From Swiss-Prot:
PANTHER family: TRANSCRIPTIONAL REGULATOR LSRR, TRANSCRIPTIONAL REGULATOR-RELATED. Keywords: Cytoplasm, DNA-binding, Repressor, Transcription, Transcription regulation. It comes from the Bacteria. Transcriptional regulator that represses the expression of the lsr operon in the absence of the quorum-sensing signaling molecule autoinducer 2 (AI-2). It also represses the expression of the lsrRK operon. Acts by binding directly to the lsrA and lsrR promoter regions. In the presence of phosphorylated autoinducer-2 (phospho-AI-2), LsrR is inactivated, leading to the transcription of the genes. One of its GO terms (molecular function) is carbohydrate binding. It is found in: Cytoplasm. One of its GO terms (cellular component) is cytoplasm. Belongs to the SorC transcriptional regulatory family. Inactivated by phosphorylated autoinducer-2 (phospho-AI-2). Phospho-AI-2 acts by binding to LsrR, which is then unable to bind to the promoter regions, allowing the transcription of the target genes. Residues 33-56 bind DNA. Pfam families: Sugar-bind. This is Transcriptional regulator LsrR. Its main location: cytoplasm.
Length: 317
């Protein structure tokens, strides 16, 4: 019996990956076939058949003989070390579009998490927009409601622009960063802004990107013009390693104080983000490892989608 490695399932996995994950959960984590079927969204009969197919094809022997084995090991370690609810580590491929593959992985995670008519809160950035582009059909068919976590309408259009016109999208009608703290306070007190922020905090699931100070001018927040290179250098000197939604935090996950941009942002603060039940972070690149680890330490995300090399770097840090 051979493994079909070309067909992709509704869960976004080829058959070999399904077999590898089932084997890992069954033999390594001690889950029952019923528990595995719930976790992967498969029938119990399908789990049983794939387990048998794994034995007959040679994937399952004394150890899991699959290129996905390393990813599963990283997922287990990340889940335990950072108390994550959900983890997906994407296998590394030479010359592959990592951002696109992370978007696919994050989209499939969200499809497994979201129930019809639930609300998804979205942060800005390339990773989240990649994800949103791959969710358009699901969002429409399941009537998922969207709400932005920050101002800056233009930052969301590459993802929102791909959606069906009938989709429910609640956008904060304000810039991401105001020209002063006073103007930011005034805008946040406007009902049209306040109502969207309250809706965002009440979301069922959130997805955010994670920026790293070490990215320098490659960081989305710089490329989008929200901060200058000089500001980023000053922020780094204050101990910041990364940011989510423009809020910077240190290696322990604590928000860095006395940073000018924090008072000028129009968006959900990280303390409020933490009240959303499921918070998915999607980020890749070894230069982001410290920032991703800090985001998990701070509790800003409790689910992660990343690539194999980044996962290894996080666990080394």
């Amino acid at each position: 019996m051979t493994i079909n490695d070309s067909a992709i399932s509704e869960q976004g996995m080829c058959e070999e990956e399904q077999v590898a994950r089932i084997a890992w959960f069954y033999y390594h984590d001690g889950l029952t076939q019923s528990e595995i079927s719930d976790r992967l969204g498969l029938t119990r009969l399908k789990v049983s058949r794939l387990l048998e197919k794994g034995h007959q094809s040679g994937i399952i022997r004394v150890q899991i003989n699959s290129r996905f084995e390393g990813c599963l090991e990283y997922e287990t370690q990340l889940r335990r070390q950072f108390s994550l609810q959900h983890v997906r580590v994407i296998p590394g491929l030479a010359d592959a579009d990592v951002g696109g593959r992370l978007g696919i992985g994050a989209a499939h995670m969200l499809m497994s998490l979201l129930q019809p008519q639930q609300m998804l809160a979205i942060g800005f950035g390339e990773a989240t927009m990649n994800t949103l582009q791959r969710l358009s059909g699901f969002i429409s068919s399941q009537q998922i409601r969207l709400v932005t976590l920050s101002g800056g309408v233009g930052s969301y259009m590459t993802g929102i622009g791909q959606l069906n016109a009938a989709c429910s999208v609640n956008i904060i009608p304000a810039p991401l960063r105001a020209s002063s703290a006073d103007i930011a306070r005034t805008l946040k007190n406007e009902n049209c802004v306040k109502d969207v922020l309250l809706a965002a905090q009440a979301a069922d699931v959130a997805i955010v990107g994670i920026g790293a100070v070490s990215q320098q001018d490659d960081a989305t927040i710089i490329r989008s013009g929200y901060i200058s290179q000089g500001e980023q250098l000053m922020i780094g000197r204050k101990g910041a390693v990364g940011d989510i939604l423009g809020y910077f935090f240190d290696a322990k996950g604590d928000v860095v104080t006395d940073i000018k941009i924090h008072n000028e942002l129009i968006g959900l603060p990280l303390s409020s983000l933490k009240t959303i039940p499921v918070r998915v972070g999607v980020a890749g690149g070894e230069n982001k490892a410290e920032a991703i680890a800090a985001a998990m330490k701070g509790g800003y995300i409790n689910a992660l989608v990343t690539d194999q090399d980044t996962a290894a770097a996080i666990l080394r840090s």
